[in-house]
Regions:
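Intrinsically disordered, low-complexity serine/threonine-rich repeat tracts
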Residues: 28-44
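OB-fold nucleic-acid-binding modules
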Residues: 41-57, 197-453
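Positively charged n-region of N-terminal signal peptides that target proteins for export
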Residues: 1-6
């Protein structure tokens, strides 16, 4: 009898343990299901750029444009648009995107700066309609006083919906917050940033940017190098541009800056350091990355970059010069004497500075027309490589004096060109902005770059 009771108790105990084990397994299953649901919620990606809607009745200042209304892409968060003068005096609206701050691509280059810039260009270049919108009823300037804080909307199909490019940059991790919560779409902007961080996209990825230079040089634009040259004296620098001229073991490299609307350039001395594939990189019309040391060239009174290298055995070495693309035409923009001898104000986020235009345009290509040659000096020194080179003193219709310095020029028959070819004539020239003996001048490298009227 006692044995039967004991067996009954043991059986009951096993049943209870089984029930609890079953309950525990169910608890584990419930917890697993809850975790799976949470993960699914976390994995759900929201297209925040499409979730906000353009309200054309909001009362905020707006202007609708087509793709032809784009004047210039500057970087990831700044674009210039053609607008009626009733919207903006001068007909140009310089839009600084609200709520975003993309990495730099126009001064000192930052990681993902080029990617952000290309992203903006790609999106707006495919648009059939663009709306630039203020956050208020008026166009509000940023700290520079020259750019206007804007939302940028675009659509790629006539019957499509507008997307908000500012928020699209944020949700793709191509911009960081910039007063992102204090605006009309602040809540959505903050969510877009949080999602980009959760997905570890681009600037939040912790990974290297494949388009960024990771060498030991300071990567910057030619504008930054030309406007703050002394700050980089003796430093190793890296920059990109198009080769316009190759002469006397030097090349001239230039790039266009849409913010100031001019080209910036630098003389690059390669000497005897390069041959073969390295020299192929330095062909006129190639877009290149130059890496070298910046120094002041005392004999010429100008800045130059030198110390170039190219090792064919290690082509990916960040210290190598590099060809980025080919077939680019040197610009040679037409420039008049008033502009050449005038001043230009450069605005940045921190300051506004005035420079001689020719100082900023040093080492860049230009065309100047209708120059009346009134005097010529010819170098007469048989021991000099410049023997036969000329300095032409020219007058313009505005009464300005322009100096044109030539190399030793030869005609199509191989004969040296002399003063008689130009004295008293009206000429058009194509050359490089140069500086000598206290004067800016136009340096001409070939007789084909002087057209006689």
């Amino acid at each position: 009898m006692n044995m039967k009771k004991l067996l009954s108790l043991l059986l009951a105990l096993c049943m209870v343990i089984g029930i609890f084990a079953g309950c525990d397994k169910g608890g584990e299953q419930a917890a697993t299901e809850a975790t799976t649901a949470t993960s699914a919620e976390q994995a759900e990606v929201v297209d925040y750029a499409a979730s906000v809607k353009l309200d054309e009745t909001s009362g905020r200042a707006q202007i609708q444009l087509t793709q032809s209304g784009i004047k210039q892409f500057v970087d990831g968060d700044t674009t210039h648009f053609w607008v009626p003068s009733s919207v903006m005096p001068g007909g140009i609206l310089k839009a600084r995107y609200l709520a975003v701050n993309t990495p730099e691509s126009t001064g000192k280059i930052e990681e993902y700066g080029k990617k952000a810039s290309n992203f903006t260009k790609e999106k707006l270049s495919s648009a059939v309609s663009i709306v630039v919108e203020s956050d208020t009823a008026t166009w509000d300037a940023d700290s520079t006083g020259d750019r206007y804080l804007s939302w940028i909307w675009y659509k790629t199909e006539e019957n499509g919906e507008y997307r908000n490019l500012n928020i699209e940059l944020l949700q793709n991790g191509l911009a960081i917050a910039s007063n992102s919560a204090q605006n009309s779409y602040g809540e959505t902007a903050v969510k877009a940033i949080a999602q980009a961080k959760a997905q570890k996209l681009n600037v939040y990825s912790g990974e290297k940017d494949p388009d960024f230079y990771y060498g030991d040089a300071v990567e910057l634009t030619l504008k930054e190098l030309r406007t703050n040259t002394a700050a980089y004296d003796g430093m190793k620098v890296a920059f990109e541009g198009v080769i316009t001229t190759n002469s006397n073991q030097s090349v001239y490299v230039e790039s266009f800056d849409p913010e100031s609307g001019i080209y910036y350039g630098m003389a690059v001395y390669y000497g005897y350091a390069l041959n073969g594939l390295g020299m192929d990189i330095l062909k006129v019309g190639n877009e290149v990355r130059i890496v070298g040391g910046l120094q002041f060239y005392e004999a010429g009174g100008t800045w130059q970059v030198s110390g170039l290298q190219y090792d064919a055995m290690t082509p990916d070495d960040p210290s190598n010069i590099k060809c980025l693309s080919t077939g680019k035409e040197p610009a040679y923009p037409e420039t008049d004497s008033e502009k050449f001898l005038g001043k230009l104000t450069i605005k940045t986020d921190d300051a506004e500075t005035e420079h001689d235009y020719a100082f900023l345009a040093m080492n860049t290509s230009l065309t100047m027309k209708n120059l009346q040659v009134v005097d010529i000096y010819t170098t007469n020194n048989p021991d000099s490589a410049s023997n036969g080179a000329m300095t032409l003193t020219c007058k313009t219709a505005a009464g300005n004096t322009i100096f044109v310095r030539t190399m030793v020029l030869v005609d199509e028959n191989g004969k040296t060109v002399t003063e008689s070819a130009y004295m008293g004539r009206t000429i058009d020239v194509r050359g490089i902005v140069d500086y000598y003996d206290g004067n800016y001048q136009i340096k001409v490298f070939s007789a084909s770059n002087i057209t006689v009227h």
